[in-house]
Every structure is written in structure tokens, then in C-alpha cells.
């Protein structure tokens, strides 16, 4: 891990992922006292606000920017964080964007698993090793279910939210590797250098998540 670069200790740089998590992340941060109005249909990747810079990144890049100190903190799915292998501080489970990573096969498939296709090779290899399954892991970029349907792989490892895609394609979950949701992650050096900004944000987000859980309202 590289220490956070020298900047104004009162200025935060946040790494936020494009896509499904971004809107919910911005809403939750606003509730925590950081109102961030990101322009729609803008090609800008860096947004400046009073006391805060927001970097819009691809999901898998958020842990990298935080770990290497370019961003002080970020929000990213636990699945992406695990796959990145980055040693960042993870103080709050934000409890939105919930899903789980599963081993999936065609319904009724019973033969040995010799090849597994996935976007999550680190997680897949760890799971297979823990089960003593000597399968080849093939990394794909999308439409993972198709690998099981075409015979490219005997099984796939992929995220599942509702399971509707699996049912529509005659696929079923064999096992759950882990559950995932959005997490707040923090650069460890920044936690010391910008403690006055980061600690209140962490505590406020934690309070909001706990309150919403108690009220059964979700956190948005």
C-alpha cells in the first residue's frame, strides 16, 4: 500500500463506481452530510465540490485507487473488493446492492466439474481449492451463464440477485460462495491524515445503516 499523497487534510477524495451502485451511493452520502450532485450524461470523470473531489471509476478500479492513496475512501461491492485482493480498511457494510456469488450449473447436471467460467477467478479458485475440486478456471467478461449452456464450462461462478436469469435459462445454484453488498472502504494512511473528516463520515454512515436496519426501511 502506498501512503495517501500530501493534500489539504480537510479535503477528501472519494472513489465511486459507475453503474448500479453510483446512484445509491450518492443518495446515502447526501444523507450523511455530503451532498454530491453529479451531472447526468457528463463525460467528466472527476467532479469537484467544496471540500470533496469525486472520481467516477470502473468498479474494479475503486479498491486500487483507495489502496494506492489516490482516493481517501470509496464505495464498492464486497465481491469486487474480495476479487481485488487489496488491503484496505473496510469500516462499514452499507447494506445496499445486495447479492451473492454462487456456483451454477444446468438443472440436473451431475457429472464432474472440470472447467469453471467466471468473472471472479480469485474467488472461484479459492472456493474450488477449499472443496478439493481440481477444475480449470476460465475468466470471461460477461454473459457468464452462456458458458454453462454452450458446454464451454461444466459450471459457472457468478453473482445472483433475484435468480430470474437462472430460471429463464434452466440453470440452478449449487452452492453459495459468499454474500456481497456495498462497502465503505478507506485508505489506511488517509484515516490518520484526514481523521477529522473521515471519522465523522464513517460514524454517520454507520449510524444511518443501523437505524435503517432497525426501522426495516433499507438505507436509502
Swiss-Prot record:
Q: Check the record and name the CDD domains matching this protein.
A: PBP2_HisGs
On whether Coiled coil is a keyword of this UniProt record, the answer is: no
Looking at the record's lineage, which domain of life comes first?
A: Bacteria
**Which pathway is it part of?**
Amino-acid biosynthesis; L-histidine biosynthesis; L-histidine from 5-phospho-alpha-D-ribose 1-diphosphate: step 1/9
Record keywords: Amino-acid biosynthesis, ATP-binding, Cytoplasm, Glycosyltransferase, Histidine biosynthesis, Nucleotide-binding, Transferase
Give the EC number(s) listed in the UniProt record: 2.4.2.17
Q: Which Pfam families match?
A: HisG
* One example GO MF annotation: ATP phosphoribosyltransferase activity
Does the UniProt entry include the keyword ATP-binding? Answer: yes
Gene Ontology CC: cytoplasm
Question: Which PANTHER family does its entry note?
Answer: ATP PHOSPHORIBOSYLTRANSFERASE, ATP PHOSPHORIBOSYLTRANSFERASE ATP-PRTASE
Designated name of the protein: ATP phosphoribosyltransferase
Q: Which gene encodes it?
A: hisG
Amino acid at each position: 500500500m502506498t501512503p495517501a499523497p500530501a493534500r489539504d487534510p480537510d479535503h477528501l477524495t472519494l472513489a465511486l463506481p459507475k453503474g448500479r451502485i453510483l446512484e445509491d451511493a450518492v443518495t446515502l452520502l447526501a444523507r450523511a452530510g455530503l451532498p454530491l450532485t453529479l451531472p447526468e450524461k457528463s463525460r467528466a470523470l472527476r467532479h469537484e465540490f467544496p471540500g470533496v473531489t469525486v472520481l467516477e471509476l470502473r468498479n474494479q478500479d475503486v479498491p486500487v485507487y483507495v489502496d494506492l492513496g489516490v482516493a481517501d475512501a470509496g464505495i464498492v461491492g464486497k465481491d469486487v473488493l474480495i476479487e481485488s485482493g487489496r488491503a484496505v480498511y473496510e469500516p462499514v457494510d452499507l447494506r445496499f446492492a445486495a447479492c451473492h456469488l454462487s456456483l451454477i450449473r444446468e438443472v440436473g447436471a451431475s457429472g464432474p466439474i472440470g472447467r469453471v467460467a467466471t468473472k471472479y477467478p480469485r474467488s472461484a479458485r479459492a472456493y474450488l481449492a477449499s472443496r478439493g475440486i481440481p477444475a480449470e478456471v476460465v475468466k470471461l467478461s460477461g454473459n457468464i451463464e452462456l458458458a454453462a449452456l454452450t458446454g464451454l464450462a461444466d459450471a459457472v461462478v457468478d453473482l445472483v440477485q433475484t435468480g430470474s436469469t437462472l430460471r429463464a435459462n434452466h440453470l440452478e445454484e449449487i452452492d453459495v460462495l459468499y454474500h456481497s453488498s456495498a462497502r465503505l472502504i478507506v485508505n489506511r494512511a488517509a484515516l490518520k491524515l484526514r481523521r477529522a473528516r473521515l471519522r465523522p463520515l464513517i460514524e454517520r454512515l454507520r449510524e444511518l445503516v443501523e437505524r435503517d436496519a432497525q426501522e426495516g426501511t433499507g438505507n436509502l
